[in-house]
Each structure stands twice: as C-alpha cells, then as structure tokens.
Regions:
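Phosphate-binding glycine-rich loop
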Residues: 2-3, 7-21
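Active-site PLP attachment segment
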Residues: 129-168
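Single conserved hydrophobic/aromatic residue that forms the stacking wall/gate
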Residues: 1, 6, 184-195
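A short helix->loop->beta-strand "cap" motif at the edges of active sites that frequently abuts
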Residues: 41, 102-105, 135-136
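Active-site phosphate-binding strand-loop segment of PLP-dependent enzymes
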Residues: 50-121
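Structural signature of PLP-dependent enzymes
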Residues: 166-176, 180, 191-193
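Substrate-binding/gating loop at the entrance of the active-site cleft, primarily
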Residues: 10-13, 24-41
C-alpha cells in the first residue's frame, strides 16, 4: 500500500538526499522510521502530547523548532494517524502545513486509512486543506490494501499535483524495480478530480 512506496524509498529517494532530515509525529508507524534509516536519512521524531483521555495533539512550536533545528526537508504526515487513530482536522493540518510551507518542507500525506474512521471527525485529504492552498507541496498516497483488504496486490495511488515534483518522481521511479501492475497511471482529468 502507501507504506510500500515510502518503504521502497520511492518518494524518500526522489525528494531527499542521504543524511537529509525527515520529520514524523510520534508515536508513528514503524515502517516510516525504517524506510528513512534504510535510505540513510535521519528521522526527526516530534512527540505528540497525550491527554488523560488518550487524545493526541501537536505542540506546533516544538514541531517548528524541530524543523528549523534539524533543517528538515520532508514531513511524513499520516491521516488518520497510525497507530493512534487521530483523524486530523483541517485546522490542525493547516497549522502543520503552514509551518512546512514557511520552511520549504515537502509533505508526504499517507491517507491509507481514510475509510477506516471511528468517531465524529470526518476525513479531510491533505490536498484539500485551505481550499488546496498547499497542494503543490503535497504528495498524497493511498491504497486499496486497507479499505478493501487487498494487500497482496502491493498497489498504491500516488497523487502529485505539482508538475515539477511529478516529473522528478517519474524520473526517479524509472531506476527502481516495479511491476506494471504497481504503476497504474491516472489520466489528467481523473487526477484533477481528486484535488
């Protein structure tokens, strides 16, 4: 699924260099750490705050400090968050993404669990936050593997609205192993309907 593309270093390899810093909000899905360290990138763990009701929130000041202190190049955002299940509100994402934009940090948004939500907060794709204001700085991913129990397909959708970033990604992926089934391309009109 989405993690396959990150773990296989497609996006990490296409958009960062060895020793670059990648930020994650912790606790976090272990493959994010592994994929970065396997690619000789450093993970910058920014701990989320947990209250007495086990709800998680972000310390935005700590997030921005970590980004500037470590010269972070990439932020891996997971919505709903894995493993805590937090569904990010548009306001929360707006705050995170504005910090990333201010410091030139690219965002990968893993949205693989978008259909598996409990609670009252609706899923909002990172691509639609602030009426799509951040879309040129976001790479969104999802997969059929969670919602439809199709993990054996090793399939993922990657949506890259920014043409320059899409070109960079397409150039990189020609140098990594893949099967034709894992690279189903979406036509331009269909892709536009997602954002």
């Amino acid at each position: 699924g989405s993690e396959m593309c990150i773990r296989d270093r497609w996006c990490i390899g296409a958009f960062t260099k060895a020793k670059d810093a990648i930020a994650v909000l912790t606790p976090v899905y272990g493959a994010f750490d592994t994929s970065a360290s396997d690619a000789q990138r450093q993970i910058i763990a920014v701990p989320m705050n947990r209250d007495e009701d086990n709800r998680y929130t972000v310390d935005y000041e700590a997030f921005e400090t970590a980004i500037t202190k470590h010269d972070v190049k990439l932020f891996i955002h997971c919505n709903p968050h894995n493993p805590v299940g937090h569904v990010w509100t548009e306001d929360e994402m707006n705050q995170l993404f504005s910090i990333c934009e201010r410091h030139g940090v690219l965002i990968i948004s893993d949205e693989i669990h978008q259909d598996l939500i409990t609670g009252s907060t609706p899923f909002t794709s990172a691509l639609t936050v602030a009426s799509g204001a951040y879309a040129d700085n976001i790479i969104a991913m999802s997969s059929l593997s969670k919602s439809f129990n199709m993990a054996s397909l090793h399939q993922a959708e990657i949506i890259i609205p920014n043409e320059k970033l899409r070109g960079q990604y397409n150039a990189y992926k020609t140098h990594v192993y893949h099967t034709d089934l894992s690279l189903i391309h979406i036509s331009e009109p269909t892709r536009r309907s997602y954002i």
